[in-house]
Amino acid sequence: MNTVSSTLISLTATCLLLFSPRQASAGTDQPAAPADTVETAEPQILRLTDDDYKAVAEELGVEVAAIKAVVDIEAGRNHQGFFAPGKPLINFDLTMFRQHARRKGINLSRYSKSHSIVFSSPDARKYGSTQSAQQERLKTARSIDDHTAVQGTFWGMFQIGGFNWKLCGCSSIEEFVERMSKSEREQLELFGNFIRNIGLDQALRNKNWAAFARRYNGPSYARRGYHTRMASAYNRHKKLEKASAENDSSKEKE
């Protein structure tokens, strides 16, 4: 074999090694990644689906539109339960935090300077958004006392107080936070457990918005119009359901 032939064979073998079958199937001429390389997906927020709504509505014996009406009022304009993956929307309540700290004998005055963010209004300008500031307040408050901070915060798309963790069917505060941080379906399940355990499922079943709002939102519900807003939201979702059903029926006839 002459020198030229030997060189060509060597080059061909090298090309075959560099361009593997895995590259060919991927349609690329870049060197293939090692076989044991695992591509990891970015963390994602697991949103509620129609099937999620239907499943929990069936468990509670209520209409899907009734649950969606509560979401419209409690979950803010975006109707979502998360600020970022693993970070549920929260509302840190300083008054509630103080109450639970007092019950545990925690002297919060010791932390007024070292943990000043906890005791001031959320600074949206400094942290980029009000929710970012709230997340930082909660994080700092948890460094004072974890359970007290969780109890002094309202969580997720249904804004359930952390002090209600047992009524949500959780065995511990840690389980409550873990489930709240997992998905919107988990938040919906916790909401279902909560209203069932305090007897509010009946009010939701009967569309008694005043009774529901009085217990869920407190005595100032009427002044804030929670009951009338829920009623309007329910009617809106029923109209959407009807329009969707009529559209599906028309498609079937075509």
PLM region descriptions:
Residues 1-9:
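Bacterial N-terminal signal peptides that target proteins for export
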Residues 9-19:
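Bacterial N-terminal signal peptides
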Residues 12, 23-25, 242:
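Residue-level detector of intrinsically disordered, flexible termini
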Residues 20-30:
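Signal peptide processing junction and immediate N-terminal pro/mature segment
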Residues 28-254:
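Catalytic glycan-binding domains that act on GlcNAc-containing polysaccharides
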